[in-house]
Design a protein with these regions (language model features):
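Active-site acidic catalytic loop and adjacent metal/ATP-binding pocket
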Residues: 1-24
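Membrane-interfacial loop-to-transmembrane-helix junctions in polytopic alpha-helical membrane proteins
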Residues: 55-58
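ATP-dependent phospho-/nucleotidyl transfer catalytic cores
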Residues: 61
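Active-site activation/catalytic loop segments of kinase-like enzymes and analogous catalytic loops
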Residues: 22-52, 64-82, 98
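ATP/Mg2+ or Mg2+-diphosphate-binding catalytic cores
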Residues: 72-116
Length: 116
């Protein structure tokens, strides 16, 4: 995946090329950078996203999907890569556990209830 800009060529990752939902990118950013709730609210405001509405539901959904994606990737990588298997397996376990614990909370269904 390449971008040509002012005569220069840049190699980019596909998931960060803007082809995915902005909510996946935003959810992944918050997850990977451990964004606190107050910081997330500031970002929502700056990005003109709807707090407490469908925008927040989509953010929640993609945050969990991002964690599951990374968890499955790391687990697979840990099984296949014998040199670093423990690190990747631990990362996979952490990411999948995050989703598992979220699914088992009382408000999980409410977090994913679209209003439209």
């Amino acid at each position: 995946n390449f971008i040509l800009l002012d005569g220069d060529m840049y190699l980019i990752d596909w998931e960060y090329s803007g082809m995915e939902s902005k909510f996946f990118d935003f959810g992944d950013l918050c997850l990977q950078q451990n964004i606190e709730e107050n910081e997330r609210k500031e970002l929502f405001s700056a990005l003109e996203l709807e707090e407490g509405g469908d925008d927040q539901v989509l953010w929640n959904l993609y945050r969990y999907l991002s964690s599951l994606t990374w968890g499955l990737w790391a687990t697979r990588k840990g099984v296949l890569d014998k040199e670093t298997d423990k690190d990747y397996l631990n990362l996979g376990k952490t990411k999948i556990k995050y989703v598992y614990e979220a699914v088992n909370t009382e408000n999980f269904e409410k977090q994913l209830s679209l209003k439209y």
